[in-house]
């Protein structure tokens, strides 16, 4: 079973200048580490031996990122990547560290992550961490926010049944979902089908339909979706 590192933010009573220096020079020391076993139904998938297409990651490579605790930067230029299949944020102490030695960041609503231009937050479910998940923040509006949930479907490898057929490799496929976040914090899933799309924008269905037609927007295009939600936010 793969071992993961659970990260807990350490509290240091030091000046701001000292804190900044520590962040740049000794980032990993801001995090106390201990091991625990992560139990998921995908825990035994070995990507090194598996014949597959697609990827469980939104980006297979580790990219330079930042970790924030209560909106305060605690780790900068740290190698990060998001495993959407098991909903884990992975990190390494350095880019020279083998990927096999990567660790999982503690899931906490107090910890946010930035990977490149993408900002991820952890949202608990009914007050609990276990069933909560990571979301990418696409828009922060005055009244409404737009979050993206990355979902990966895993289809196991299928061995050839006869000599006339071939093995079908396992595959990871993307199935993202988008959520409108209301002022009270409630998540409303935005339908992907055109006939139901406007139902997410309660009270402004006609205005949203007109805005889409006038601007020739594609609801399946993420940039257009951001425009739509931003417009909805502006007319409420």
Where are these regions (language model features)?
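N-terminal ordered "arm"
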Residues: 46, 50-64
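Long, compositionally biased interface segments
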Residues: 189-192, 198-236
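Sec-dependent signal peptide cleavage junction
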Residues: 17-51
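Bacterial Sec-dependent N-terminal signal peptides
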Residues: 1-25, 228
